[in-house]
Amino acid sequence: SYTGRLNYAGRSGSASDSMEAEEQTPGGVGIQVQGEWTHHFSPKWSTTVNAAFATKYFPDITADVAVRHYLKNDWEIGAHVGYGRVAAYTKRYEWNDEFFAGGTGDNGYLFTGWNESKTNLLTVGGELAKTIEVVRLNTKIDMHFFNSNFYYNAQIGAKYFPANDGKTNINAMASIGSAPETAVLDYALPGSFSHTNTMVGLGGQYMVSPNITIGLMGTWNTYYNQTNTVRGSSPLNPIESISTRYKNLYNIYAQVYISF
């Protein structure tokens, strides 16, 4: 079967590209377009291949291949490998004579914006799931390969299917790991890896017709954020330091699924 997904994300923030020191990207909306192909080789084996492209608030490019094996008593195991092209941000500072003269005389470097670079992220993961009547429980762990190091993110989830269509559901999830949940990697990089990051989410999906399903998902991410700061009393001698703190990020995702 083939499935097309359209994901929409809205974020608060500046209405222009002139961001404040705590905003890595301006506010607005982002769109992700995803295509997916699923094939059942037998009653016990299936594979799924998907790829996605996005404007902002999502990784630029993602691709994933998954294999699933169906066991007795409604148990499932799966494995997947994926690739994502995500953004990393560093603060940009420039020397400003007027700022230096109007201050206390110990700093003349003024924040002027964010430098953005792209980072390749490889992911390998496994999943275990169990269906109990109208409830599906699952747990999965992802290993992320980034900057020659491995990091992890573990997630648990539950879906309740109140209808008999197999698609309408209410779902909840939570995750913890040394890497943040994949959906916020653009906001978390750099510096978020090797520290504890958490996420909780709640949402649902409704089947409008046999070919169209709509969904709404809200998530709350708490992630470790690391940024650079430049100070100095001379344009020839900048002093760079690192500031760290935990940040909260709230997302609301609107989703449209079209299958055929």
Protein language model regions, located:
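Outer membrane beta-barrel transmembrane domains
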Residues: 159, 167-223, 228-235
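Solvent-exposed loop/turn segments connecting transmembrane beta-strands
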Residues: 9-14, 22-32, 52-63, 85-90, ...
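Transmembrane beta-barrel strands of outer-membrane/channel proteins
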Residues: 2-10, 49-53, 63-65, 79-85, ...
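Membrane-embedded beta-strand positions in outer-membrane beta-barrel channels/transporters
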Residues: 32-34, 62-66, 76, 123-125, ...
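Detector for outer-membrane/organellar transmembrane beta-barrel domains
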Residues: 96-186
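Residue-level signature of outer-membrane beta-barrel architecture
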Residues: 39, 69, 128-132, 160-162, ...
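Repeated loop/turn-to-beta-strand initiation elements of outer-membrane beta-barrel proteins
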Residues: 2, 40-49, 73-79, 132-139, ...
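Outer-membrane beta-barrel "beta-signal"
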Residues: 206, 245-260
